Curated annotation (Swiss-Prot):
Its main location: secreted. It comes from Bothrops alternatus. GO terms for biological process: killing of cells of another organism; proteolysis. This is Thrombin-like enzyme bhalternin. Negative results: does not present azocaseinolytic activity. Does not provoke vascular lesions or hemorrhage.
C-alpha cells in the first residue's frame, strides 16, 4: 500500500511538471548558455526592445523596426535575474539601414535591417563571440535555429527570463507568398517555420538571428499574430544578399550602394 502511494505521488509530480513545462514554452526550450554568444539585447529606458546579432567586435546587425531613441546594447546575457561576470553594455556610435523597394504588404516598409556600430569594441569573453556573415545562401529544407527573449505565449505577452531556442525549417519563398498576401514575386527575404504550426519566433524576437547549418542566414523581420499558426511561417531578411554591402560599410566605404 505504501509503495502504491509513493508511485501515485511520483506520477502526480511528473504530470504536474509536464503541464508546467508545456505552459512555459511555445515550441522551444531554454537555449544552452553557450549557443547564443552572438545574441544581443537591445533596450532603452522603456525596457526590452529587440534582439540582434554581433557580427564582429564593433558591429551588430538587427531589424530596422528596432530603431529607437537612446538604445543600449547588452551582450553576454543569459538570465535577466542572474548576471554573468562577462556581461557588457554598449551604446551605438552610428546606425546604417538596409533599404528595399516598398511592397504592397502593409507590414513592410522601405527599411528592413539596421547595422549598428558600437561606440566601443566588445571585449572577448566566454559568453560573447561574433557570428560571421554567411559565405553562401541557405538551401530550402535546411533545419534552422531561431532564438531570442521574445514572448513564449502565442496570444499574450509573456517574456521569459532566459532566451529560448527552437528548430524550424527553411521553406520555399512561394510558401510565404501564399501565406501572406501582397508579397512580390521575388524578394531578398527567407521563409521559415513549421507548416504544422507550434514552433515560431514571436513578439520581442524581432531582429534576432536565423542560423542554418551554423551560419547566420536571416534576421527576423515579421510574422503573423498569434504566433505559431499552421501554414503561417515567418519572414526573415536574407543576410547573404547583403553580405558584400555590409562588409563594405564596415570597411569604411559609406558611399556603397545597397542592393536593390
Amino acid at each position: 500500500m505504501v509503495l502504491i502511494r509513493v508511485l501515485a505521488n511520483l506520477l502526480i509530480l511528473q504530470l504536474s511538471y509536464a503541464q508546467k513545462a508545456s505552459e512555459l514554452v511555445i515550441g522551444g526550450d531554454e537555449c544552452n548558455i553557450n549557443e547564443h554568444r552572438s545574441l544581443v539585447v537591445l533596450f532603452n529606458s522603456s525596457g526590452f526592445l529587440c534582439a540582434g546579432t554581433l557580427i564582429n567586435q564593433e558591429w551588430v546587425l538587427t531589424a530596422a523596426n528596432c530603431d529607437r531613441k537612446n538604445i543600449r546594447i547588452k551582450l553576454g546575457m543569459h538570465s535577466k535575474n542572474v548576471t554573468n561576470e562577462d556581461e557588457q553594455t554598449r551604446v551605438p556610435k552610428r546606425s546604417t539601414f538596409v533599404s528595399v523597394a516598398k511592397t504592397s504588404h502593409q507590414t513592410l516598409g522601405t527599411r528592413t535591417s539596421m547595422l549598428i556600430r558600437l561606440k566601443r569594441p566588445v571585449n572577448d569573453s566566454p559568453h560573447i563571440a561574433p557570428l560571421s556573415l554567411p559565405s553562401s545562401p541557405p538551401s530550402v529544407g535546411s533545419v534552422c535555429r531561431v532564438m531570442g527573449w521574445g514572448t513564449i505565449s502565442p496570444t499574450k505577452v509573456s517574456y521569459p527570463d532566459v532566451p529560448h531556442c527552437a528548430n524550424i525549417n527553411l521553406l520555399d519563398y512561394e510558401v510565404c507568398r501564399e501565406a501572406h498576401g501582397g508579397l512580390p514575386a521575388t524578394s531578398r527575404t527567407l521563409c521559415a517555420g513549421i507548416l504544422e504550426g507550434g514552433k515560431d519566433s514571436c513578439q520581442g524576437d524581432s531582429g534576432g538571428p536565423l542560423i542554418c547549418n551554423g551560419q547566420f542566414q536571416g534576421i527576423l523581420s515579421w510574422g503573423v499574430h498569434p504566433c505559431g499558426q499552421p501554414h503561417k511561417p515567418g519572414v526573415y531578411t536574407k543576410v547573404s544578399d547583403y553580405s558584400e554591402w555590409i562588409q563594405s560599410i564596415i570597411a569604411g566605404n559609406t558611399d556603397v550602394t545597397c542592393p536593390p
